[in-house]
Amino acid sequence: IRLDSLSNQTAMANVSRIEDPMARALVWTAACDAARDAETSSSDFIELVFAHLETETESTTIQTILRQLVTNGNLYIPIGTRPQALERIADGLIDLVTKAKAGSDSQLQFVKFLPIFARSASQQQWMQDLLSGKIQLAGFTVDQDVRWELTTGLVMNGVFGESEIAAELARDNTANGQRFAAGARAAI
């Protein structure tokens, strides 16, 4: 859908106040489409997400928005400002993780998407601390899949290497663990 200028401004400023989940999803879709089609800037879309995603209640909508952030951050942000945009997204996800309802699906989704964006030393340290248990999130268990996702994210950024992959594989020497280890090794 396309919104006229006034409707777009009103909807984007108030997306988190829209009560009907379907209407909210349509507004989010319009925002994603506008960023994709360069009708609004990708950085504006990122700011919209972090101004309103915290209150989104629909798990599928959250996942769709996070996937759009991946596309937006990796394809639509100009290369010259991409590192800053990816750091902004990671910082926003860390903030959302800490504010999310304990044990919620949104909390899990924010953690799972974080390794895709985390670039700075502080973001890498946050992931290491979550992986090691130094950071404890209420209601959140760092299960084996999350361990692999964090490990792979740390490998992608050169923080972890073969020894950490081997240690994780020793912990999870299953078919799934073998698949995750292959993915982590491919990220070296």
Segments from the language model and where they lie:
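Long, ordered, helix-rich scaffold segments
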Residues: I1-I188
